[in-house]
Structure formats: structure tokens, C-alpha cells
Regions:
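Generic anion/oxyanion-binding catalytic loop in active/binding sites
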Residues: 22, 88, 110, 142-143, ...
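Conserved phosphate-coupling serine/threonine residues in phosphotransfer and NTP-handling enzymes
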Residues: 114
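Active-site phosphate/pyrophosphate-handling residues
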Residues: 66, 101, 152
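Short, well-structured alpha-helical interface segments that form or flank functional binding sites
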Residues: 97-98, 177
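Asp-based, Mg2+/Mn2+-dependent phosphohydrolase catalytic module
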Residues: 1-7, 104, 117-270
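Catalytic-core regions built around general acid/base machinery
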Residues: 98-107
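Proline-centered loop/turn at the N-terminus of a beta-strand
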Residues: 109-111, 189
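N-terminal helical cap/lid subdomain that shapes the substrate entry/recognition surface
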Residues: 3-97, 117-119
Length: 270
């Protein structure tokens, strides 16, 4: 069998995966979203109103720009939106050698898959000292009308980078919604970076199941006692390093151990 047919491919989310969500940068970006809405969305006059409008729409559309367009807010320039809401990466983010060491330990093609625009994603990677670690970046501009967790966004990623067997891909991500699609639709190896994002999604999921709440079809088959039951591995602490991965909880399969054997060997040598 040819080497390329057995090699693993590694796909990484950006926010909350390649840097800890507790860093505060993602929260600052969200605050700038609310400020942008006050400036550019008619009828939204305060940050509190913006947060309320954003909350329900984001849960449904999974990306702020799509959510705003769906609500009829289209009188602003997309480049201006991304530049304003994702600014200051070089001030907020800094290289973390232990995360770089983890990424470098993996032998195979490596890609970043993010719902933010690829231009701003690349700026963040430069700030993180990771820009030379990846074979490609796939972002909102590349996806067009779709985004994670929609299967069409994954299909577009695979097509762009000629990924022929998604089951030989490992997906590192802090969002259960996105991992769920990777697992159900493509049989990818899924690695959850457990952080505040997980808490937010579980809380939102619980709220959606209260009486009179709209059902969330994506959650219908989840284990009520453990919504993370489907993932292959859970990295706790919100930071992706060789050490944290070596302490990960490997859940239903050992595929994650096989796929990330190089990183685990690195842990045994430290």
C-alpha cells in the first residue's frame, strides 16, 4: 500500500485550539462584534442589545457574519467587519513553544480549518509563531455560503486540499458541534480541546431541551449523560501540548492513539 494512502492528515481549529480560549482574545473579538453591530446594524443601539440579538442568531447560524446577514443586516463591508472584529492578534497572541512542539511532532499534512476569515487566521498564526507549521489555511472566505459545522464546509475543505479519505484525518477542535459533524458525517478521529466553549455549548444544549424551547436536531442522538461520549479523545485544561495530549482521556476507540503516536512517543521521552 502506498505511503500516502496510509498517512494521517491533521486538521486544526484555530480559536480555543491552537491557543487557549482563556487567553481572552476570543472574548475580546466577541466584544468588538457587539461594538460593530452598534455602529453598523440599524436598530441595535447598545452593546447589551447587540449581545441579545447575537446570542440566538449565532446559535442557529454558527458564524456571526452569516447570522447578521440572515437578520437583514447587510449594509456593511465584509472586509471592514473582519478587520475590525479580528484586529490586534499580534498584541493579544504570543508563541507557545509547547503547542508548536505538539504540531511539529505530527507527521503528515496539517491544515487549519476555521470559521473566521483566512486572512485574519493567517495573521493569528503569525502571532502564535505557527505560520510555517501548516500546509494550508481554510477559512470563511474559502467556504463562501457555508461554515462549520455544516457537512458542506468539510466537503469544501477536503476538495481544496485533495483529502481522499476523511477517516484518516484527525480533527482537533474545542466545539462539540463541529466535532459531531466530523464524527457522524466523515468518521474523522475527533479530539476535543475541553475549555469554556464546552461549558457554553452544554449549557445552551440544556436550555434548548427545556419545555417550549426549539429542538436542536444536531443533538438528537447524543448521550444525555455524556454529550462528549462520541469523541475519540479529550484534552483537558484548554491547552494543546504534547504533555496535555499524553494525559488525554482516550474514549471509544484507540484510533487517536495510533494517529498521534509520534506526539505520545515525544511525551515518553520528556
Amino acid at each position: 500500500m502506498k505511503e500516502e494512502e496510509t498517512a494521517w492528515t491533521y486538521v486544526f481549529d484555530l480559536d480555543g485550539t491552537l491557543y487557549p480560549i482563556a487567553n481572552g482574545y476570543e472574548r475580546a473579538c466577541r466584544t468588538r462584534v457587539f461594538e460593530f453591530m452598534v455602529k453598523h446594524c440599524p436598530g441595535v443601539e447598545t452593546v447589551e442589545e447587540a449581545r441579545s440579538v447575537w446570542s440566538g442568531a449565532f446559535r442557529r447560524y454558527n458564524q456571526t457574519l452569516r447570522a447578521l446577514r440572515s437578520l437583514g443586516f447587510d449594509g456593511f463591508d465584509e472586509e471592514e467587519y473582519w478587520a475590525y472584529t479580528r484586529s490586534d492578534a499580534k498584541e493579544a497572541l504570543a508563541p507557545v513553544e509547547s503547542t508548536r512542539a505538539f504540531v511539529e511532532s505530527l507527521r503528515g499534512k496539517k491544515y487549519v480549518f476555521t470559521n473566521c476569515h483566512e486572512k485574519q487566521a493567517k495573521e493569528a498564526l503569525v502571532a502564535l509563531g505557527l505560520s510555517d507549521c501548516f500546509d494550508g489555511v481554510f477559512g470563511a472566505g474559502d467556504m463562501g455560503a457555508v461554515c462549520k459545522p455544516e457537512p458542506a464546509a468539510f466537503d469544501a475543505l477536503f476538495s481544496r486540499f485533495d483529502v481522499r479519505d476523511p477517516s484518516r484525518c484527525v480533527f482537533f477542535e474545542d466545539s462539540l458541534k463541529n466535532l459531531r459533524t466530523a464524527n457522524r458525517s466523515f468518521d474523522m478521529v475527533t479530539v476535543l480541546i475541553a475549555s469554556d466553549t464546552l461549558t457554553e455549548e452544554i449549557d445552551a444544549r440544556a436550555a434548548s431541551r427545556r419545555p417550549n424551547a426549539a429542538a436542536d436536531d444536531d443533538d438528537d442522538d447524543d448521550d444525555d449523560d455524556d454529550p462528549t461520549a462520541f469523541v475519540d479523545a479529550i484534552v483537558r485544561g484548554g491547552e494543546l501540548t504534547i504533555e496535555s495530549f499524553s494525559r488525554a482521556s482516550f474514549k471509544p476507540t484507540e484510533r487517536a492513539v495510533e494517529a498521534c503516536a509520534d506526539a505520545l512517543r515525544g511525551a515518553s521521552c520528556t
